[in-house]
Amino acid sequence: MQLTGSEILVECLKEQGVDTVFGYPGGAILNIYDALYKHSGEIKHILTSHEQGAAHAADGYARATGKVGVCMATSGPGATNLVTGIATAYMDSVPMVAITANVTLPLLGKDSFQEVDIAGVTMPITKHGYIVKNVEILADTIRKAFHIARSGRPGPVLIDITKDVTAATCEYTPVTIQPEERVTRYTREELMLVAEMIHKAKKPYIYLGGGAIISGASAEVAEFAELIDAPVCDTLMGKGAFDGRSERYTGMIGMHGTKTSNLGVSECDLLVALGARFSDRVTGNPKKFAENARIIQLDVDAAEINKNIRVDASLVGDLKKTLTELNACLSKQEHPEWMAHIMELKEKYPLKYDDENLSCPYIMQEIDRVTNGEAIITTDVGQHQMWAAQYYHYTKPRTFLSSGGLGTMGYGLGACIGAQIGQPDKVCINIAGDGCFRMNMNELATASRYNIPIIQVVINNQVLGMVRQWQTLFYGKRYSQTVLKDKVDFCKVAEGLGCTAIRVTKKEEVAPAIEKAIALKAPVLIECMIPEDDKVFPMVPAGATISEVFDGDDLKRQS
C-alpha cells in the first residue's frame, strides 16, 4: 500500500508493539504528529513539559517494562533538549529509540532555521544513529533501529528524518517482528574452566550488576548463589536482581556500599561479576580492588572484559543463557565458615542513621513498610539516591530506576511518569532532593494533565546534600554554592501545577502521608523537611581502596 513517510513511521511503531510515545511537537515534525493523531487509539502520546522530560520518561518506561522506550522531538532545540536523556540511557544500557525531524533536504547544511546536526551531536552517546533522506529506506531503518536498541547490550538509537521524507510516499509492506536471539560467544572449554575455578574457591563472592536485570536472569542468579554457596552484593544498577531480603544479600558495594560488601569482597578468594562493568564508583582504587581474589566476569559486551579490571576468566554472552549453561555444569558447594564470617560482618556492621529526627533513611524504611517493598522507586541523584538504595528492600527486578552512569540530576520525575504508564498497576514513587527537583519539576504538570498517579517525595534539606557532604569532609566546610535556602515553596508549586501537596516535618507524619498519597490515585507531592547536616554512610573516599570504607562511628572515634 502507498503511505506517506509519517504513516509508515506509525505503522512501523505498531509493528514493534509500541503503545506509548513521549514527546513535544514543532514545525519540522508536524507531519508525524498529524499521523499520530489519526492513530491515537492505538498509540498513546504523552505530551511532556520539556523534551528532556520526554527522554527521561521513555527511559523510565523502558526500565520498568523491558520494552523499547520511544521519545520524539522536532528539529533544532527540540532535538538538542533530548541529549541529556539520551546520554543517560546510553550510560545505563537502556533500550530507547529517539525520533527527531529535521529541516527539508534542500535546507540541510545551510544553517537553516532550527537546523542542528543532531546525529553528529549524539554520535558518542548512541549505539547507532540514522539520518533518513529517502522515504524508500524509512521502514527498514526504523526496524534496524529497534533491533539495535534492544539486542546485545541495549542502548539508545537516534533516527533523524528530514521533513520532506515525512510527506513523501512509497510502498509499505508490513512485516512480523521476530524475538531477539540470546547469543553467547564462548567455547565449552571456557565454560568448564570457569566451573573449575568456582569449584576450587573457598571464599566466593557474587558481584551483581545491571546486566542481570536487562537479561532477565534473576532466577538463574538465585540458583547460582545457592549452588556455589556465596554471598551476593550488588551495584546501583543491579538493585532487585537478587532478593534484597535474602540472608545471602550483603547490600551494595563501592563508594556508598555496606561495610560487609566492601570488606567481604576485599577478603574473598573468588569474585564472580555478573553483568557488571567494574565502575570506578564500585572499585575505588582499581589496583587494590579484590586483590586477594581471582576474578571471573560474565557479560554480554566483550568490550567490558578487562576494560577497568583485569580478570582471570570471562564468558561473553547473554547472562541468562550463560548462567543456565554454567549452573548445569556446577555441583553443589558448601562454605559454612566463609558464610558464617559474612554473617558476622553483617551483624557487626549494620547500616545506621540518627533516628531521633526525621531523616531520609527513616522515610525510605516507612515507604518500604507501607508498600511492602512492592513499589517502583525512581530517584534523582545525590544523598537521597544512596539512601533510597540502602534502606528500601528491592526484591524484584525493574523496581529501582536511577541514573547510575551519568548521574543525571532531574532524571527521576520523568522516569517515574514513564514507569507509571508502563506499569499502571504499580505504586510508583520518585525520591528527589530539593536541588534535583528544581531541575525538571515542570513535569508535575504532565502528571497532572493525564492524572498519572505518581508520588513525588522531595527530601528537602535546603542544600545540595552530596556536594555539601564532600565540602564538610574534604573542603574545610567551605560551602561554596551548595546552600539553597530561598523562598521556594514546593507545595505551592505542586498545587499550582494541579497536584495535591503534603508537607511532612515529623516522623509520625510519614506513613499517613504515603498512605494518603497511594489512596488518592492522583499525582501527589510529599515534601519532607530534614536536617542539612545528615550524611550518607558508609563511604569510601575517592581513589581509596574499598577496604578503607568508613562510617559515622569511625569519624566520631577519630575526632
Predicted features and spans:
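Catalytic phosphate/nucleotide-handling subdomain of diverse soluble enzymes
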Residues: 411, 415-453, 459
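Glycine-rich phosphate/pyrophosphate-binding beta-alpha loops
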Residues: 27-29, 76, 93, 156, ...
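N-terminal alpha/beta PP-like core and its mobile active-site loop of ThDP/TPP-dependent enzymes
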Residues: 1-330, 366, 370-373, 453-456, ...
